[in-house]
Amino acid sequence: GDMNEIVFENIFLDKTVLVTGHTGFIGSWLVTWLIYLGAKVVGISLEPSTNPSLYESNGLKDFIIDYRKDIRNYSEIEKIIQKHRPEFIFHLAAQPLVLRSYDEPMDTFSINMMGTTNILEVLRRFDFTTVFINFTSDKCYENKEIDYSYNENDKLGGHDPYSASKACSEIITHSFRKSFFENKENQISISTI
């Protein structure tokens, strides 16, 4: 392959990678690829929400360190991150459903905002090199009700609790990057996708 394929192929080899929400659909596919690329994967998630789940169907539990913890529990998240000191963190743990957010707005906001805040606070308090990628959603942008592809320069917003919580998660990530990581030599890179 070309140089880009070689670099990408080896970037996760023998690296410790934390994936929150690893039992969900996207998290399960991400873990599958990370294992294939040679990563040492640590997962933090609740029980899978479907039965059977992709996580179970792919037989991933035998290939990773699997924690079943609530992302809102700061002390548990802190212990896991301190113990494993991941070189990459992919944050996918979320309440991901728009319709559920109408029935459970408090849970939606607490999971999607405090989960992000908890991980970033651990990184702020403890010095080690890592890359943090916060997976949000195109729903984090203000809904213009037009046929339009959103881009990262669009205004954040949200007409429903889920969308608003994802916009807040983007703002929290940006705030931590600007306030604590941008001009420090702690070797923490932060981004959202």
Question: Model regions: which residues?
Answer:
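N-terminal Rossmann-like NAD(P)+-binding domain of SDR-like oxidoreductases, especially those catalyzing
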Residues: 1-193
